[in-house]
Curated annotation (Swiss-Prot):
Keywords: Cell cycle, Cell division, Chromosome partition, Cytoplasm, DNA integration, DNA recombination, DNA-binding. Residues 105-286 form the Tyr recombinase domain. Pfam families: Phage_int_SAM_1, Phage_integrase. GO terms for biological process: cell division; chromosome segregation; DNA transposition. InterPro entries: CB, DNA_brk_join_enz, Integrase-like_cat_sf, Integrase_catalytic, Integrase_recombinase_N, Integrase_SAM-like_N, Recomb_XerC, Tyrosine_recombinase_XerC/XerD. Belongs to the 'phage' integrase family. XerC subfamily. Forms a cyclic heterotetrameric complex composed of two molecules of XerC and two molecules of XerD. The active site is at 145, 169, 238, 241, 264, 273 (o-(3'-phospho-dna)-tyrosine intermediate). It comes from Staphylococcus aureus (strain MRSA252). This is Tyrosine recombinase XerC. It comes from the Bacteria. Residues 1-84 form the Core-binding (CB) domain.
Length: 298
């Protein structure tokens, strides 16, 4: 990558507080774009709208999903917007390119029984289970992003208000409450997990060496929990975030409150969680609709 692209990624990291995972995606998108430029003998600063359309066709020819293509085009549009702020002679070739429509997927979430099974897996009275349980509790109890989790400091935990202050996207702070189970797991972890007691930093979640845990480390922990849990086949941090939102809405929480807890800027982003479970929809329907049941049915 050239120095402009490197400066762009650094701006996303420092000024916009992008996570490691998101930055890696942006970097991969730029590398793939550079490979296309080299293959077609094109220059970054003379790239035109016609070339952008050809690049769109090139991406589709690689049998990528529309969501992936959409993200890659968005990355390049954002990159050129950044470059334009540095050089008035640069034109954004992607600004008029029609965004491919995204496939709509319902967010995946865990049922309450599945969450109970996951928590039972980390009930063992071991040092590692103390740490693993606090990760699981915080992600499910608060719905925070994994990038927010790994940056929590000990002083961000408020045991008086029973909640945590996190730094979200765009460096925006928000306070998210947690319940009694989460509080207890944090207290047990701080009191009995030896690596956290001997470290020389303030990060809350650490690995077995006492070092601040990484996003990759959190994913490893969650995958390890799943391997030891019968009846649960897949997990990722965002699935726990989906579960948090879905369970709140299923129990009657209003959309605006969930939006605030998740740290979403737009209500439409939170709206995808109103799918609730099919089982919950049918339960509400049967109880609410006058002609949902015949008189002799229960």
């Amino acid at each position: 990558m050239n120095h402009i692209q490197e400066a762009f990624l650094n701006t996303l990291k420092v000024e916009r507080n992008f996570s490691e995972h998101t930055l890696k995606s942006y970097q991969d998108d730029l590398i793939q774009f550079n490979q296309f430029l080299e293959q077609e003998h094109l220059q970054l600063n003379t790239f035109e709208y016609r070339d952008a359309r050809n690049y769109l066709s090139y991406l589709y020819s690689n049998h990528l999903k529309r969501t992936s293509v959409s993200r890659k085009i968005s990355t390049l549009r954002t990159f050129y917007e950044y470059w334009m702020t540095l050089d008035e002679n640069i034109i954004n070739p992607f600004v008029q390119l029609v965004h491919p429509k995204k496939e709509k997927y319902l967010p995946q979430f865990f049922y309450e029984e599945e969450m109970e099974a996951l928590f039972k897996t980390v009930e063992e009275d071991t040092s590692k289970s103390l740490r693993d349980r606090v990760i699981l509790e915080l992600l499910y109890a608060t719905g925070i992003r994994v990038s927010e989790l790994v940056n929590i400091k000990k002083q961000d935990i408020d045991f008086y208000a029973n909640g945590v202050t996190v730094l979200g996207k765009g460096s925006k702070e928000r306070f998210v409450p947690f319940g009694a189970y989460c509080r207890q797991s944090i207290e047990n972890y701080l009191e009995h997990f030896k690596p956290i007691q001997s470290c020389n930093h303030d990060f809350l979640i650490v690995n077995m060496k006492g070092e601040a845990i990484t996003e990759r480390g959190v994913r490893y922990v969650l995958n390890d929990i799943v391997k030891r849990t019968a009846g649960v086949s897949e997990i990722h941090p965002h699935k726990l975030r989906h579960t948090f939102a879905t369970h709140l809405l299923n129990q009657g929480a209003d959309l605006r409150t969930v939006q605030s807890l998740l740290g979403h800027v737009n209500l439409s982003t939170t709206g995808k969680y109103t799918h609730v479970s099919n089982q919950q929809l049918r339960k509400v329907y049967l109880n609410a609709h006058p002609r949902a049941k015949k008189e002799n049915e229960t």
